Amino acid sequence: MEYETVKVSKENKVATIEINRPYLLNAFNTQLILDLQQATKFVKDDNDIRVVIISGSGRAFSSGADLTEEDSGWDGSKDALIRGFKPSFENIISMPKPFIASIKGPAAGI
């Protein structure tokens, strides 16, 4: 699968989701949120995958929300959490596979 802000690879039944916005320390913008929704659904639904690793490219896992994004399309923080992040979290929580976070550098909240 091809995404704008995440890389997904699969090798030996292990999938890796790499957040790929290193120039902004992998800050979460709208596109990253949508790509992460699709990527987590893809690895959840692929029965050949047994383990999932999520990491960040560059020197940080994530610096949190992208404060430079002017029009996110969300109607406030609550809407971003419900429509944006919740589907990804639900994919991860309901996934019957180990989901490992490989964190280096900053890992800030959203």
PLM segments and residue spans:
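Conserved CoA-thioester-binding segment of acyl-CoA-metabolizing enzymes
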Residues: M1-S57, E90
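Small-residue (primarily alanine) positions within well-ordered alpha-helices
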Residues: A15, A39, S63, A101-S102
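Histidine-centered beta-alpha loop that forms part of the nucleotide-sugar donor binding/catalytic region
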Residues: N20, A65, K104
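Glycine- (often His-adjacent) and acidic-residue-rich active-site loop
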Residues: K41, D48, G56-N91, A107
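Glycine-rich beta-to-alpha active-site loop
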Residues: N91-I110
